[in-house]
Amino acid sequence: MIIARIFGHLPIATTWEHHVTDILELARTKVLNNGEGLNKEEVLQVLQLDEARIPELLELAHEVRLKWCGEEVEVEGIISLKTGGCPEDCHFCSQSGLFESPVRSAWLDIAGLVEAAKQTQKSGATEFCIVAAVKGPDERLMSQLEEAVAAIKSEVDIEVAASIGILTQEQVDRLKAAGVHRYNHNLETARSYFPNVVTTHSWESRRETLRMVGEAGMEVCSGGIIGMGETLEQRAEFACDLAELNPTEVPMNFLDPRPGTPFADYEVLDTTDALRAIGAFRLALPKTILRFAGGRELTLGDLGTEQGLLGGINAVIVGNYLTTLGRPMEQDLDMLGKLRLPIKALNASV
């Protein structure tokens, strides 16, 4: 059995710690049987589980995702329409124009976006997300995105998502009319920790954009980065902040410290803490697409990535990210085949 092989190197505890007594049994009833996410206090207990119980946690999280999301894995590619030169000060991001990072501003043309969408579709992906490093779109960016979506949809059989910052109601309506079916705008971290990560705009402005997106009928995609110095209590708060959005998708990133940013010297999150977070987020969000995004290669490696895919994750970004290198697309597809996880677009094991 694959899951036994993957988790076999970690012993399963024979006794349970008093302060987390029966939290996984509670989750089995509340989440697995009833489809109800854990609350903040319960998520915190999961995040505090002893290392020896991580295999048990991930096995339960995998059962939850199979029951409430199905066995298929959603594959997505992302592309940057506008890279660098962002006026915001997100402390983790090398695309900010306020930091001395090696990233320089650049735009991709429509032909380049269409070609990238074609290559992404060939992998079996169902999602192609166009991203821009901006606080919010100006008219030039809106017009170019509308043109790009039309061009892609006319030539490529793939769903187009977008991530271009804080929106007005008029911009939300235009994206919906253009055919954008899912919109990504990450909350990034817990509301209480956000001022430690971003000071040039508010957590509430991000939340308001997501409210408008959902009310317009687009799918809501919002996640963030684990391991930016937040406490376990704030990590639990973040999971429940996201659950309140009723999102279609939550991308899980892990901090990959970027040169020149305020977080450049932060330590990489411990693998066991990353696995706890994956399991906990699945138990908080039982019916949501939970996607591996940036930082998994550094934080989890190959084995941890496999554990995550058998521990609650049911979607991946293939290829490179916005400013960091991912794994070659073929490696991820081979891994899904090894684990006998079917890709959604192909509807068959790879």
UniProtKB/Swiss-Prot annotation:
Presence of the UniProt keyword 4Fe-4S in the record: yes
Entry binding sites for [2Fe-2S] cluster: C129, C221, R291
S-S bridge residues: none
Co-factor(s): [4Fe-4S] cluster; [2Fe-2S] cluster
UniProt EC number: 2.8.1.6
Pathway: Cofactor biosynthesis; biotin biosynthesis; biotin from 7,8-diaminononanoate: step 2/2
The protein's assembly and partners: Homodimer.
The protein, known as: Biotin synthase 1
PANTHER family: BIOTIN SYNTHASE, BIOTIN SYNTHASE, MITOCHONDRIAL
Stored CDD domains: Radical_SAM
HAMAP family assigned: BioB
GO MF term set: 2 iron, 2 sulfur cluster binding; 4 iron, 4 sulfur cluster binding; biotin synthase activity; iron ion binding
